[in-house]
Amino acid sequence: IYQVNWFRRDAERRFLWPGFGENLRVLKWIIERCQGSVGAQETPVGNLPLHGGIDLAGLDVSHEHMRQLTHIEPQDWLSEMDEVASFLHGYGPRVPQALHEERERVSQGLRQQAGG
């Protein structure tokens, strides 16, 4: 499972990624990752493209924009994990224990990344 936020913006509120047909570049990386033909940086929330892992030929996307696009902000993700916990709690005992364990594993990794 991969999650992509096509709508991340910089400090000036400009989109970091050009979108539209260029999204195929990211989808290509995902397919190649699933095939095991490209590497990835492991993070608490999943694998991210390595520097240069997504073909940027012909695009006006700086390395700084790519850094921002792939940046994991632990506190933001920890807030997301709290929301996931509340959501799962609403389903009571019907939620498989493995989902609770995975959420906790991700949260623990994020706390470690945040230095706490």
Please identify what each model-predicted range represents.
Residues I1-G116:
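Flexible, glycine-rich loop/tail regions that form catalytic "lids" or insertion modules at the edges
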